Amino acid sequence: MFDTVCTLPLSADLFSQALHPKEPIVSVGLSTGHVQTFRLPSEESDTDGDGAESTSSSRNGKGHIDTMWRTRRHKGSCRCLGFGVDGEMLYSAGTDGLVKAAKAETGVVENKIAIPPAKDGSVDAPTIVHALSPQTLLLATDSSALHLYDLRIPFSPVSARPQQTHHPHDDYISSLTPLPPSDTSTSGFSKQWVTTGGTTLAVTDLRRGVLVRSEDQEEELVSSVYIGGLRASGTSRGEKVVVGGSSGVLTLWEKGAWDDQDERIYVQREAGGGESLETLAVVPDELGKGKMIAVGLGSGGVKFVRMGMNKVVSEVMHDETEGVIGLGFDVEGRMVSGGGQVVKVWHEAVDSDGMDGDMAGGKRMFGSDSDDSDDGDDSDDSDRESRKAAQPQRKKKKNKGKGGQDIMGFADID
């Protein structure tokens, strides 16, 4: 189904990953507090220095990945990243208690927000940052707080306070998925979103606050994603939120029926409990694969679940020792997976013989990411946190041992 086109090594453990909504750009946040932004090569025909055209340079392994900028953005780890809805701004949040808004193209910081401290006065470390619209930024923290900020208010010590704060869960918020705007929406932006935290799912409204919280699911809910266009039948409208659990099970929730799940899909069965489903992404319809979810596992694999059939139909391996932290599809339909100290870019497999599940997925590249050119306006001192101290509460399971892998990558990588 997918095969790696390149492997991009990082200088430290990946804690967060974000894909630009309009351009082939990926940003990463690291355990050291660094934020780095890369431009991926285009799948479309391009022209070399002699004026000759080369088709799909990223497929033949000769494209360039350009480092647009790199800086030590936070004095602790960079826990979360998110682009604005138009891609102009990149929001990052770190364990230093700050949210920073920077120009996506240059990395220059234009705004800062101090995260409200925990009740004991300590830093309330962030877990999610999400731009809901050009006006609203959502920020979730370890203490289970969900802060809403009005981005139209210029920064000042006073205006840095959130406009609203909710507590939809008793535990920290592990995922946030916006619901599509209603047919009567005049703005075209979402005003409701689903969150998971601890063992519950909740729905929050921009104006009315927390609307509903589910029954206790008796397992930790880790990740979530919305998928529409499914087959409608009976009371089902063909719109669901898919939730990944800590024991290898996907649960399906009918939009509007939030009290309890209505279907279960076993993604990874193991004795004593399955592997945690760390991150989810909808496979773009343009790829012609039907309605499908990509699932990033704590064991380092990525499994593909076909909706309707409700079963795993294919699998690739991101890494054999590190879990998948980031997973998504760029504007050209390439899958981007991140975890450990590597980001991988995948394209649709060429000359597939139908044995997608048997494809080798972990292709390595010589060299390592340079740490010599830290650009930007932030501090670049040598403060480094251990992964154990800075990682969110949930531990990643690891498989022992590592198999041999082929070598493939882009030339002239920065």
UniProtKB/Swiss-Prot annotation:
Tell whether Nucleus is among the UniProt keywords.
yes
Its Gene Ontology cellular component terms are: nucleolus
Compartmental location: Nucleus, Nucleolus
What's the main place this protein lives? nucleus
Which spans does this entry mark as compositional bias, Acidic residues? 369-383
Name the UniProt key words of this record, in alphabetical order: Nucleus, Repeat, WD repeat
Repeat (WD) positions are: 9-48, 73-112, 118-159, 222-263, 319-356
- Gene3D superfamilies linked to this entry: YVTN repeat-like/Quinoprotein amine dehydrogenase
Please list where the region (Disordered) is annotated: 39-65, 352-414
Similarity-based family: Belongs to the WD repeat WDR55 family.
Q: What is this protein called?
A: WD repeat-containing protein jip5
Q: What's the source species for this entry?
A: Neosartorya fischeri (strain ATCC 1020 / DSM 3700 / CBS 544.65 / FGSC A1164 / JCM 1740 / NRRL 181 / WB 181) (Aspergillus fischerianus)
Phylogenetic classification of the source organism: Eukaryota, Fungi, Dikarya, Ascomycota, Pezizomycotina
Q: Which gene encodes it?
A: jip5
